[in-house]
């Protein structure tokens, strides 16, 4: 089913009144322009999206890994059509602005990045991120000039939309085993000039490195938290100038961790004490009521 059709059929199921896409696009951009940092959590299905909306979060972001795990696949194996249908389902679940993990634009060419932005808009999204590394194992980042061309093409596609779409450009050095801060900064500066609205270098773990990135660019910076060994609070991140904090697949992996602990308890001990940590049936049902 095409994302736009899925969105149209699912719209009535949304939790709360729906804003128009231009209104959501403007609201999402406003979050990046106000004082302080905000958290944009990453649901992996309509149910978790509605729970996060119920808890009062102001915007959501998809997680490619979290979604892949939910359908029994490793990260990086979901195609563009399925990704867009999934994004449309997240959009339709609530009235919140949604930004998507668009991987590398599902192709190496600048035209692939541009086309993915157009499809993201059709799916109801008001933001999306483009990575600078191929969707192949053990890949190095694209050569800088090619990476710039890809961001520039995506930014041009954004400018051709009829509403505000927030484009995030990602520098993947640290996630592909190349922890080069200078090259990361050089790339983010280039992506800024190519038209990115938000800059993001996942994998930065120290406050000093994050601060160095922020001081080197003049666009809002996203960081990812929820990584093991990284204990920086929202207040600490806001104090050094971070604007947006996502959590990637960590909510999904946290839920899967609880699932596996419960399953192993049953298998290994034949006991069911895990139930004491479960949310009550009444509480979870109430959260899903319109």
PLM segments and residue spans:
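Short, Lys/Arg-enriched N-terminal segments with co-localized hydrophobic residues
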Residues: 6-17
């Amino acid at each position: 089913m095409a994302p736009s059709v899925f969105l149209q059929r699912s719209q009535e199921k949304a939790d709360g009144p729906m804003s128009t896409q231009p209104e959501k696009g403007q609201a999402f951009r406003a979050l990046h322009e106000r004082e302080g940092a905000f958290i944009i959590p990453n649901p992996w299905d309509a149910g978790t999206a509605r729970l996060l909306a119920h808890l009062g979060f102001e915007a959501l972001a998809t997680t490619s890994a979290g979604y892949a795990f939910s359908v029994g696949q490793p990260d990086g194996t979901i195609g563009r059509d399925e990704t867009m249908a999934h994004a449309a389902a997240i959009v339709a679940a609530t009235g919140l602005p949604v930004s998507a993990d668009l991987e590398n634009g599902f192709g190496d060419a600048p035209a692939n990045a541009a086309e993915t932005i157009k499809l993201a808009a059709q799916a109801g999204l008001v933001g999306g991120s483009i990575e600078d590394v191929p969707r192949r194992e053990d890949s190095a980042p694209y050569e800088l000039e090619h990476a710039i061309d890809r961001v520039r093409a995506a930014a041009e596609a954004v400018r051709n939309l009829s509403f505000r779409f927030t484009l995030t450009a990602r520098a993947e050095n640290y996630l592909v085993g190349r922890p080069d801060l200078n090259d990361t900064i050089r790339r983010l500066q280039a992506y800024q000039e190519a038209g990115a609205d938000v800059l993001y270098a996942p994998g930065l773990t120290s406050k000093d490195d994050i601060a160095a990135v922020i001081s080197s660019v003049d666009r809002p910076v996203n960081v990812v938290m929820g990584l093991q060994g990284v204990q920086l609070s929202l207040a600490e991140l806001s104090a050094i100038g971070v604007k947006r904090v996502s959590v990637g697949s960590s909510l999904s992996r946290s839920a899967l961790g609880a699932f596996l602990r419960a399953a192993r308890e049953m298998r290994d001990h034949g006991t069911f004490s895990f139930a004491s940590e479960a949310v009550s049936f009444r509480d979870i049902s109430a959260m899903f009521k319109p």
